[in-house]
Amino acid sequence: SGKTTTLYSTLKTLATKEVNVCTIEDPIEMVESSFNQMQVQENIDLNFAGGVKALLRQDPDIIMIGEIRNLETADMAIQAALTGHLVLSSLHTNDAPTAITRLLELGVPSYLVRATLVGVVAQRLVRTLCPHCKQATEPDAEVWNAMVKPWTLPLPKQVYKPAGCQECRETGFKGRQGIYEVMPFS
C-alpha cells in the first residue's frame, strides 16, 4: 500500500546530520544509512513497545514505529511524543479520521490523543491508465457528480478510459499513484 515508502520519504526529508532518526520495524524493509534502525525480534521478546523503550535510551529526535498494533505500543508512542520526540507510525484504518477512533479503540485516553497527535495522513494507491493506449472520452456529468459528492466541482473538459495494449498486457492500466488525505491538528 506504500506506507513504508511514505514513512521513509518523510524521514529522509527530516533527517539531517544534527537529527537522530531511529526506527523500530518488522521487518526492516529498506536499509537507510542516515537512520538508526532496529528490527523487532520476538524470539528475544523485543517487540515494538520494547523497541521504543530501547530507542528512547539512544536520545532520538525522531522515532518511527513500523506499526501500532496494540495498546502497549500505542502507550510507548504516546510517552515518546509527550517527552518531546517526533513519532511517526502506521495504523491500519480506512481513512484519516478513523485513525483517532482506532487509537481510542486500542485504549489510548482521548486527552492523550489530543495532547500528542499533530496530524494523520491516510493513503491509497490507485492504478493509473496506460499512457500508451488510454482513450479520450466525453465526461459523464452524472458519474462525475456522484464521484465528487458532496462537493460541487466543474466537469472536466477531457477524461480518459482504459483500452488495453501489449505495453499493459491488455489491462489498460500501468503503474500506481498515491492519493493522500491529510488531516492536521492544531
What positions do the PLM features span?
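Short, flexible helix-loop junctions that flank or precede catalytic/ligand sites
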Residues: 1-186
